[in-house]
From Swiss-Prot:
Single GO molecular function: ATP binding
Gene3D superfamilies assigned: P-loop containing nucleotide triphosphate hydrolases
Keywords: ATP-binding, Cytoplasm, DNA damage, DNA recombination, DNA repair, DNA-binding, Nucleotide-binding, SOS response
Transmembrane parts of this sequence: none
Gene Ontology CC terms, in alphabetical order: cytosol
Encoding gene per record: recA
Organism lineage: Bacteria, Bacillati, Bacillota, Bacilli, Lactobacillales
Official protein name in the record: Protein RecA
Primary site of residence: cytoplasm
Binding site for ATP: G79, P80, E81, S82, S83, G84, K85, T86
Length: 378
């Protein structure tokens, strides 16, 4: 019986060795034909953790789970008109430039306001801008920029404005069923591999439409077919909620709006989280406002009545004064921002690793003094 078992083990081992050799030969042939890295074992990849770029909003970074937009992925931002979609995208552009990257903006709507973009922190002198004549031209330009590998972020505003050339050349009233959907489907197939290879972030802004005759369920849909929905790793639903009234002389005026950004699809972290931000007219997302709100919830900033304080020091009476204080003290803003990100696991706690034990430091000083004394005696 023992001999039979041993013989079976030898046959299995021999068969396994032959399969392993056949696999190694196949991998060598594939590598020879298609280049190194065409097929690899998942554990051999140097970068298993998804690289991200901050969205420019702390609340949105937290909602995204990974700490920002994943690099080498497609992002879709959609919502009703004037909900803040372009504002969210422009904050990403400003962040990409802040990190030393190059950003491109495909303005298919021909409606980009350079002054507003600059107010959000975008360096308009360095921003690559294209206002294409047709959808095919816009997507082709985006493809060439992505293929270059030199662009970190490409924004397309918007998918609904990417009009196929056949529709432009035709007459108003002509029926062009499915043209835009086919164009977007082909573009996604061509762009997705290049986007992943070059680690470019591609943001597609989209509008909302309503399905005709829908009695039950959500009648809202996005134009451009289903391809973008499938290929997007992250989909954000941006909707304004309530108006923000001013203070003092502006108490009867609207100075901004509360906005909810819902992560309706997320392939790199759990979805369906919501970021609540304040979009101020002419300024964009209030970074100080969202920081005060989140830090107060975590008790990093303490609130007593109308007063806000940090580390026992008062930083303002009322949220507006606290916002101004943080805006005037960027070092303090960065310190609190870092603590919040550490709390949510978006950053490692560098303070703990950098902290020095006072007793150990004193011991090191004594050792150095002793060494100096010995050298003098010598």
């Amino acid at each position: 019986m023992a001999k039979k078992v041993k013989k079976n083990e030898e046959i299995t081992k021999k068969f396994g060795d032959e399969r392993r050799k056949a696999l190694d030969d196949a991998l060598k042939n594939i590598e020879k034909d298609f280049g190194k890295g065409a097929v690899m074992r998942l554990g051999e990849r140097a970068e298993q953790k998804v690289q991200v770029m901050s969205s420019g909003s702390l609340a949105l970074d937290i909602a995204l789970g990974a700490g920002g937009y994943p690099k080498g992925r497609i992002i879709e931002i959609y919502g009703p008109e004037s909900s803040g979609k372009t504002t969210v995208a422009l904050h990403a552009v400003a962040q990409a430039q802040k990190e030393g990257g190059i950003a491109a903006f495909i303005d298919a709507e021909h409606a980009l306001d350079p002054a507003y973009a600059a107010a959000l922190g975008v360096n308009i002198d360095e921003l690559l801008l294209s206002q294409p004549d047709s959808g095919e031209q816009g997507l082709e330009i985006a493809g060439k920029l992505i293929d270059s590998g030199a662009v970190d972020l490409v924004v397309v505003d918007s998918v609904a404005a990417l009009v196929p050339r056949a529709e432009i050349d035709g007459d108003i009233g002509d029926n062009h069923v499915g043209l835009q959907a086919r164009m977007m489907s082909q573009a996604m197939r061509k762009l997705s591999a290049s986007i992943n290879k070059t680690k470019t972030i591609a943001i597609f802004i989209n509008q909302l439409r309503e399905k005709v005759g829908v009695m039950f369920g959500n009648p809202e849909t996005t134009p451009g077919g289903r391809a973008l929905k499938f290929y997007a790793s992250v989909r954000l639903d941006v909707r304004g909620t309530t108006q923000i009234k001013g203070t003092g002389d502006q108490k009867d005026s609207s100075i901004g709006k509360e906005t909810k950004i819902k992560v309706v699809k997320n392939k790199v972290a759990p979805p369906f989280k919501v970021a609540e931000v304040e979009i101020m007219y002419g300024e964009g997302i209030s970074r100080t406002g969202e920081l005060i709100k989140i830090a107060s919830d975590l008790d990093i900033i303490q609130k007593a009545g109308a007063w806000f304080s940090y580390n026992g020091e008062k930083i303002g009476q009322g949220s507006e004064n606290a916002k101004r204080y943080l805006a005037d003290h960027p070092e303090l803003f960065d310190e609190i921002d870092h603590k919040v990100r550490v709390k949510f696991g978006l950053l490692e706690d560098t303070e703990e690793s950098a902290a020095v034990d006072p007793a150990a430091a004193k011991a090191d000083e004594l050792v150095l003094e002793l060494d100096d004394a010995i050298e003098i005696e010598d």
